[in-house]
Amino acid sequence: MNGTLDHPDQPDLDAIKMFVGQVPRTWSEKDLRELFEQYGAVYEINILRDRSQNPPQSKGCCFVTFYTRKAALEAQNALHNMKVLPGMHHPIQMKPADSEKNNAVEDRKLFIGMISKKCTENDIRVMFSSFGQIEECRILRGPDGLSRGCAFVTFTTRTMAQTAIKAMHQAQTMEGCSSPMVVKFADTQKDKEQKRMAQQLQQQMQQISAASVWGNLAGLNTLGPQYLALYLQLLQQTASSGNLNTLSSLHPMGGLNAMQLQNLAALAAAASAAQNTPSGTNALTTSSSPLSVLTSSGSSPSSSSSNSVNPIASLGALQTLAGATAGLNVGSLAGMAALNGGLGSSGLSNGTGSTMEALTQAYSGIQQYAAAALPTLYNQNLLTQQSIGAAGSQKEGPEGANLFIYHLPQEFGDQDLLQMFMPFGNVVSAKVFIDKQTNLSKCFGFVSYDNPVSAQAAIQSMNGFQIGMKRLKVQLKRSKNDSKPY
């Protein structure tokens, strides 16, 4: 369909095809044209119809293409979420069609670094014109008007931009430059925001480092709530983008290898999933959730609704990650998620079973479990009191509260076993079985709680937990009435 006489047959090259929703099903193309032409000449309108009906009926949405990009953007600013059409309950939804997103400017825009400061825009165009049609070329200049030695080049397609990167990146060293030319996709707004957040967090960490508290991630306890939320947000964005370099640039994470960073990203993604899960499903209750158990030692029942946030309480447990000097566990991420989203431990634990499985799977990817770190995570007095009677004891709890644990590390003793299972409830006994002839551990033991709920929480969190090259097997001890003890 052609435009009016004062317009060419085709829209401008940078025109945008817009998708428009929340349109009355009774409206015709004429009605829509009258609406849109208030903002500029319309090239084409295409109403989406249900072809299964006879005659085909409108689906209540359409595509519209203006002759100019400016008209499309003006229409979007005036209509999107602003105007409710007759007979509709919600405002118009107007945004670029998916086909336009696939050719977004950010997908075609290149950053060119390490160029000679003598180069002009025309020189850059000549240099890159062989790879395709250039939509825009701009050299970055300082307040004095002099080149900063870098530029932006936007091609009409992403394929052209990719070809230019392959051919030109580090292909030559220009006059006055100390290293080869850099050609890469320009940072998107999301990339810029992520870098800004990382810089803010790095500055805060450096201040803490000056006080020598950054020996490990236990220093997170001294961070204010806003920075804990920032930390989790950075982890979640990194997890979704797959860019682990941002994590490795942070001071306390510099010693982590790629696998450890991936585990961190997996934990962040899982924490994000738990945070976004509707709380009404109640697939796992607060009392049985590993998250609630791991965070319960540091928070009161009312802490999730309190306006004052205690960073230590919200973080919960922290322990070593795969033998590195810094690490996070599910409890700590749950605490940060609580700060970030206004959820307490109970809010996170009311997620679906699949969410908790994702958390457990991500958490079990951590290669080592440092039981020696646990005393610092929980109340030392409580640990001492329980250690007196529980370690080495074979006292049993009520039915359903007694656990059998396989695949313990050879070096684990009664105290280690107690420390590892204390976070899930009151332990009445913890015993590692020893070979009487060799005086070495048989690599299995028993743990008894004073209630079945704690035992189930321990099974959910610790069954399959990896220690070194083995995974723990945690299950209920058989009843006394059974012929076999386990």
Swiss-Prot record:
Question: What keywords is this UniProt entry annotated with?
Answer: Acetylation, Activator, Cytoplasm, Isopeptide bond, mRNA processing, mRNA splicing, Nucleus, Phosphoprotein, Repeat, RNA-binding, Ubl conjugation
Where along the chain is composition biased (Low complexity)?
Answer: 284-309
Q: Name one GO cellular component term.
A: nucleoplasm
Induction section of the entry? Its RNA-binding activity on CEBPB mRNA increases in response to EGF.
Q: Which residues form the RRM domain?
A: 16-99, 108-188, 401-479
Which tissues and organs express this gene's product? Expressed in skeletal muscle, uterus, diaphragm, lung, spleen, testis, mammary gland, adipose, eye and brain (at protein level). Strongly expressed in aging liver (at protein level). Expressed in lung, stomach, heart to very low levels (at protein level). Expressed in germ cells of the seminiferous tubules except in the central region that contains the elongated spermatids and spermatozoa (at protein level). Expressed in Leydig cells of the interstitial tissue (at protein level).
According to its UniProt record, where is this protein located?
A: Nucleus; Cytoplasm
Pfam families associated with the record: RRM_1 (PF00076)
PROSITE patterns membership: RRM (PS50102)
PTM remark: Phosphorylated. Phosphorylated by CDK4 on Ser-302. Its phosphorylation status increases in aging liver and is important for the formation of the EIF2 complex and activation of CEBPB mRNA translation. Hyperphosphorylated in the EIF2 complex. EGFR signaling regulates its phosphorylation status in epithelial cells.
Establish whether keyword GTP-binding is in the entry.
no
Subcellular location, principal: nucleus
InterPro entries the record matches: CELF1/2_RRM1, CELF1/2_RRM2, CELF1/2_RRM3, Nucleotide-bd_a/b_plait_sf, RBD_domain_sf, RRM_dom
> Site of the Glycyl lysine isopeptide (Lys-Gly) (interchain with G-Cter in SUMO2) crosslink?
K109
- PTM sites of type Phosphothreonine: T4
One GO process term, biological-process aspect: negative regulation of translation
GO molecular function (one): mRNA 5'-UTR binding
Kindly list the positions at which N-acetylmethionine occurs in this protein: M1
List Phosphoserine occurrences by residue. Answer: S179, S302
Q: Which SMART domains match?
A: RRM (SM00360)
Region Disordered, residue ranges: 277-309
Role played: RNA-binding protein implicated in the regulation of several post-transcriptional events. Involved in pre-mRNA alternative splicing, mRNA translation and stability. Mediates exon inclusion and/or exclusion in pre-mRNA that are subject to tissue-specific and developmentally regulated alternative splicing. Specifically activates exon 5 inclusion of cardiac isoforms of TNNT2 during heart remodeling at the juvenile to adult transition.
Quaternary structure, from the entry: Associates with polysomes. Interacts with HNRNPH1; the interaction in RNA-dependent. Interacts with PARN. Component of an EIF2 complex at least composed of CELF1/CUGBP1, CALR, CALR3, EIF2S1, EIF2S2, HSP90B1 and HSPA5.
Q: What is known of its domains?
A: RRM1 and RRM2 domains preferentially target UGU(U/G)-rich mRNA elements.
What's the protein called, per UniProt?
A: CUGBP Elav-like family member 1
Quick one: which gene encodes this? Celf1
